[in-house]
Amino acid sequence: MNPVLFSLPALVAAPVPPAPEIAVAAVLDDWHRAAAQADEARYFGHLAPEAVFLGTDGTERWDKAAFQAYAHPHFAKGRAWSFKAVKRHIAFAAGGTVAWFDEDLDTPNMGPCRGSGVLELRQGTWKILQYNLSVPIPNALMGEIKTRIAQHKP
């Protein structure tokens, strides 16, 4: 018997871990899908325990527990939110265990949005450490928006 023939099937059948960029994109896509499907456990399972979510309102800086408390009623109703990435850029720190990204989002309720954030590879799983949701404002509208924000009374 030729030992090479017995080794070859083992090499072919061995699972190959996904490329880091594909793995990070898969986590982000599943995170957004979990919100659209109102799967609260799956959604918050993608966040690290110390994660921070920055919302579009200047007052919205939530740690994971506060964000979950805010979001729970939406998930409990069976509808959270729907974000679909239409463009995404992902980069990695030296060592490959920290990634950052920005993504353009299509959202039915808010219109075009942008998300950016940081993930860390922990025990083979990418976890979201920070997510910043923003609404891009065309530069031509900035003066009007700035005035309206100044006039806004919370």
Regions found by a protein language model. Name each.
Residues 25-29, 65-69, 127:
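Generic alpha-helical structural signal
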Residues 16, 52, 66-112:
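Surface-exposed, charged secondary-structure patches
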Residues 112-143:
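Short beta-strand edge/turn micro-motifs at domain boundaries
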Residues 47-48, 57, 87, 94, ...:
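A mature extracytoplasmic/lumenal domain signature
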Residues 53-55, 139:
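A short acidic, helix-capping loop that chelates divalent metal ions and anchors anionic groups
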Residues 31, 43-44, 51, 67, ...:
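Hydrophobic pocket/interface hotspot
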Residues 4-49, 140-154:
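Short, low-complexity N-terminal intrinsically disordered segments enriched in polar/charged residues
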